[in-house]
Amino acid sequence: MAQCDWSSDVCSSDLSGGTPGGTGETRRSFAGWLLSAVREVVIVVSLAMVLSLVVKTFLLQPFHIPSGSMEDTLIKDDRVVVGKLTPGPIALQRGDVVVFADPGNWLGDVPVKQRTPLQSLLIFLGLAPDDSDEHLIKRVIGLPGDKVACCDVQGRVTVNGVAIVEPYVKPGDTPGGGRPDFSIVVPAGKVWVMGDHRSDSADSRMHDDGTGALGSVPIDKIHGRALVVVWPLSRLSWITAPQSVFGSVPAATP
């Protein structure tokens, strides 16, 4: 708006509504607000990434199920969440379903997955399931010192001399899965694992030399206990360890 001093015949144009330097101050104010907003977003995202990494490292981690060796409890391409407090603060138990790193070339040569940088970052942070196919998932049947054998006259697995009835074995399979009989003692610091799909699981039975030494999985290779199926949503469910199966099994004797 133009303003004039009629006594001196001088007019001036005030485009800022009467506030000198208003446009420049507005721009500086907006730039300051934008910088503050960006800084807050960076802080929030950084804290979220750190928190995700801490959760993945110490508490929970998602994994992808690459095969049908645990059917029908788990099926191929399920996504599960694994609790990292087992083993550790929460002790391993017979019947636990555990994810572990390949203990001795059980998987052979695994091709390297081709991922985008974003996919790799999400897996590293624990925001996407590990699909590297370098891990296995099986059920713990024997703890350190346990004597595990298969099969008795009724075709059942025995642990420390007690036959167990396993409702989680895939319908149509036998507890032995048609594999040769065995009788082993689980070495210290290891566990004996078997898949629920007994006829289609390359587990401890397939990698042992008859002593339990080679087929048993070192506990320090275990990443954690599978807790829940989270994907697909139609299969959302808890993964339980049926303690009643092993309730009458005595502790291992020295």
Describe these PLM feature segments:
Residues 40-58:
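Hydrophobic membrane-insertion alpha-helices, especially the h-region
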